[in-house]
UniProtKB/Swiss-Prot annotation:
ISGylated. Phosphorylated by TXK. Phosphorylation by PASK increases translation efficiency. Phosphorylated by ROCK2. Phosphorylation by TGFBR1 inhibits translation elongation. It is an enzyme of class 3 (hydrolase). GO terms for cellular component: cortical actin cytoskeleton; cytoplasm; cytosol; cytosolic ribosome; GABA-ergic synapse; lysosomal membrane; nucleolus; nucleus. Residues 14-21 are annotated as: G1. Translation elongation factor that catalyzes the GTP-dependent binding of aminoacyl-tRNA (aa-tRNA) to the A-site of ribosomes during the elongation phase of protein synthesis. Base pairing between the mRNA codon and the aa-tRNA anticodon promotes GTP hydrolysis, releasing the aa-tRNA from EEF1A1 and allowing its accommodation into the ribosome. The growing protein chain is subsequently transferred from the P-site peptidyl tRNA to the A-site aa-tRNA, extending it by one amino acid through ribosome-catalyzed peptide bond formation. PROSITE patterns: G_TR_1 (PS00301), G_TR_2 (PS51722). The modification N6-succinyllysine is found at K392. It comes from Rattus norvegicus. This is Elongation factor 1-alpha 1.
Amino acid sequence: MGKEKTHINIVVIGHVDSGKSTTTGHLIYKCGGIDKRTIEKFEKEAAEMGKGSFKYAWVLDKLKAERERGITIDISLWKFETSKYYVTIIDAPGHRDFIKNMITGTSQADCAVLIVAAGVGEFEAGISKNGQTREHALLAYTLGVKQLIVGVNKMDSTEPPYSQKRYEEIVKEVSTYIKKIGYNPDTVAFVPISGWNGDNMLEPSANMPWFKGWKVTRKDGSASGTTLLEALDCILPPTRPTDKPLRLPLQDVYKIGGIGTVPVGRVETGVLKPGMVVTFAPVNVTTEVKSVEMHHEALSEALPGDNVGFNVKNVSVKDVRRGNVAGDSKNDPPMEAAGFTAQVIILNHPGQISAGYAPVLDCHTAHIACKFAELKEKIDRRSGKKLEDGPKFLKSGDAAIVDMVPGKPMCVESFSDYPPLGRFAVRDMRQTVAVGVIKAVDKKAAGAGKVTKSAQKAQKAK
């Protein structure tokens, strides 16, 4: 087998009809974890329903339907391989909770793949003021997804088909647009593709002899190639934050007979090891980690990205819960936030938001009502420059610096220190009305919390 390939996460963004599903389906289909039998079954069903022309998207549709019904699908279906990477598609938009997922970050994407449709009138609809192309790209950038690949899709349906002129026009427009957001177009691979016909997906297309390939220039090494798969292969490998102090937001806490209390969650930063003394915030409980396991196997250490369960001594299920954060008691332990300052972008709110507004925030695994205590300044959402001090209200499209106060104890961090704990979605009326990035946290001085006997013993022994 040789060395394991590096795992990377991508998020696929773009307007509804840009062909994201077909393109993604094509990659999964040709390089992915779906076995031949399943593919044949899908093809047969698609043909019976007269959806033969829809087979790649159909693959994704089947997966999505199962995902939405809460059937935990075999996640290998959302994976495919390039020569260098195992790629996981962490979310495909069109999924109701896409924006929320992208922000609360079931995982952080290493790269965004923006699909734009080249068909007559389609590109214009996608990038128009109310098209989703802009919003998705802006979100990706705001949330720290700094690498981007652009697939100019449906090249087979331009006028005339595979038109170089149309492709160049789109590249020019998208470059201007992503530059305004903050991406540097020189670092972005643009690839003319047909997710349906397969042009420039895995193999160079014979239909576009004019396309001499894509090139990116960046300080960590330049790259060039022809296909979308090659562009994915040239994503810069992520650096996982093992050197930071531990932060592990809890997804659940189980009580397991004969073992005891087992919190479960994903290590976001740092390392979790048996024998460590951890503090849970905001509840301020400190205890010793007895064992750590993943997929029912004991680990000597858990690293960022690992979903683990860990057994803690002398702590009841009532002491800790989902949304709490575990950290190393001796190395910048997590603390309750009395309040925090954030930069927010209002996405879709029907009215005006003023001080006192108290929607629910989804930040890492916490889900807590927070009050917009003070609107400090309105800013330009691209440059971050101040537009006005102390605005009276905010409306859709506005960006602002806001002081927020949680309604219940909560643990968050600044985006610059701990990115996964420093971005949030604002939910109201069953939709995401705003997104935010935390600039600074006012930490509550922790009183004497609960320190278990095993923690005291472990601390003495050290």
